[in-house]
Amino acid sequence: MVLKLLGAAVCLLVLAAYIGGRKSSVGTSASEPLPASASSTGAAVPSGPVILKPQGADGSASVRVGDAKFSVSPDGRTLFVEGGIGRRFSADLEQALAANAFLQRIVITSGGGYAGSGLDAAGSIRRRNLTVRVRSHCASMCVGLWASAAAREMEPDAVIGLHQWRVACDVLADAEQRRECEYSAQFWTAHEKSYEGWLRSAGFNDRLLQLQKQTPADQVALLNVPALRENGVDFRVVDPDGHYLNREQTRRFLLNKYGRRGAD
């Protein structure tokens, strides 16, 4: 949920995969060990997913999740969501859907949040047959929203982040946060199969599901467009205006955006 380093990681991933010409795959077999964690400064670019551990993270849900900002495009067809999946997220989404009957797409930037609100929102997205596009990053519970969509899109420089859901609630000093953490853990245990089912329906293979289960809750495994493609995830790459980009167009988009930084 706490992804302060996402911006730098996004840049590293896309430069390594497209401009530097390096592959960004996740091993060759489900039993292959995961890559070593990258440093928190993002100084190295591994050939697999980038594993980040925000400084001060302790494996607990100790940081309170804020509520995302919602806005609707002038034509009423696109809902823009930016921020955490907080307590009000599902209710805010339902309100936006009810007020905008012609919504077709959600464009989201989120580091994740609470399982209960997120899973409820994923169900709403599924029922409305919405398309979900990732802008910049979508991690933790946000990936469930993306996977549950009728169609998935990613902007070329976007990443998704996976990690497990087991958290150390007992280390929290604040009683309210501890109760909230324990409730989320119980809720997640009861609904884990739904989350995994959505990921599988989106094309996540056993290798990626293993990555999600093996990455500790206080870390995040970031995957870019090439890594997701190579592992069979079903999505389209589009530019910020929604135009489809093939592999060569994606490469050119990133060259134009980032120049030659990191190419050598």
Regions found by a protein language model. Give the residues of each.
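Hydrophobic membrane-insertion alpha-helices, especially the h-region
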Residues: V2-G21
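STAS-typified acidic loop motif
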Residues: L34, D58-D92
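Second-shell loop/turn segments in exported
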Residues: T78-I85, V107-G113, N129-R135, R178-Q186, ...
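Extracytoplasmic/secreted envelope proteins and their assembly/folding machinery
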Residues: S90-L97, G118-A122, R126, V143, ...
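Charged, glycine-interspersed solvent-exposed loop segments at helix/strand-loop junctions
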Residues: C169-R261
